[in-house]
Amino acid sequence: MSKPNQTLGEFIIENQSDFPGSSGELSRLINSLRLAAKVVNHEVNKAGLVDIIGAYGETNVQGEDQQKLDVYANNKFIQTLTNREIVCGIASEENDDFIQIEGHKGDHQNKYVVLMDPLDGSSNIDVNVSVGTIFSIYQRVTPVGTPVQKEDFLQPGNKQVAAGYIIYGTSTMLVYTTGHGVNGFTLNPALGSWYLSHPDMKFPEEGQIYSINEGNYIHFPQGVKDYIKYCQQEEGNRPYTSRYIGSMVSDIHRNMIKGGIFMYPKSSKASEGKLRLLYECNPFAFITEQAGGKASDGFQRIMDIDPTELHQRVPFFCGSKKMVEKAEEFMANAKANPQSQEFSFSSK
């Protein structure tokens, strides 16, 4: 039961009963993530005053130019989790391979692994657009006491223990789930504490916002083009409006509050999709489903996909349940009728 002015620490302690036999390890892990987020938030807020914006001069494993804040955030989250000896391994979008972590005694007694995108949307930081951190937590599948292995990270999203994101915007929020609903906490910068501000967050079943980079329209699959036309068509007084920030955390956060769909399909420029299954799609799929929404690759549930590599990419559709289902309907019809250039938009 949420309480007025409840802090994140109080909330975590109160809800440990959701996990019978819990040792408190997951609680300490989430506490460590909130600490790292506060440190990163401090740097994001003064980015225009110090030499921490702009390109770092290197590319990550994705072939993307690393921003200085990408590197800073990645280092801070890894350092915080490593120093507290509460995880056995970390995989980051910014690193080629996973990181094995052992305790100060040289042992491997911890049972959780963390996968993360330390700073999503960082290319927008120069123009003062909100950015965010995305994280996902799993229990390892290899024996405790042994070094973590790749298979500990290559688990389907339905095995997640917890997932969340931090949005660094006009206010800083941490939103997360442990499989018992979604709750949002806002940082009070004067006190340095996170307070429960958005209890039991839910996607409206139907929404009015569709979020997609329409500049890539010509490269999209026919089903996606058809769905966009459906949203734009005036016939039937459809209430849809396009809103796209270009920061995944910001777009999905808004859509969860207002109601809408976020889409990043495959395209002729990115045949497998662009977003990472493990670092971006799985955590947001878990959050979305716990908030009453839906997440898929256009044809199947995201969290049922068995990953084959750490940096695997997939198409991604998530948001209000009815909007995602309608997009899937257009995708299915385009696949079943490949010769047809347009689907009938008369359906309600």
From Swiss-Prot:
InterPro entries the UniProt entry points to: FBPase_C_dom, FBPase_class-1, FBPase_N, FBPtase
Any Gene Ontology CC annotation: cytosol
Main location: cytoplasm
Transmembrane segments: none
KW Lyase (keyword) present: no
Subcellular compartments: Cytoplasm
GO term, biological process aspect, one: fructose 1,6-bisphosphate metabolic process
Assembly and interaction partners: Homotetramer.
Entry protein name: Fructose-1,6-bisphosphatase class 1 2
Encoding gene (name): fbp2
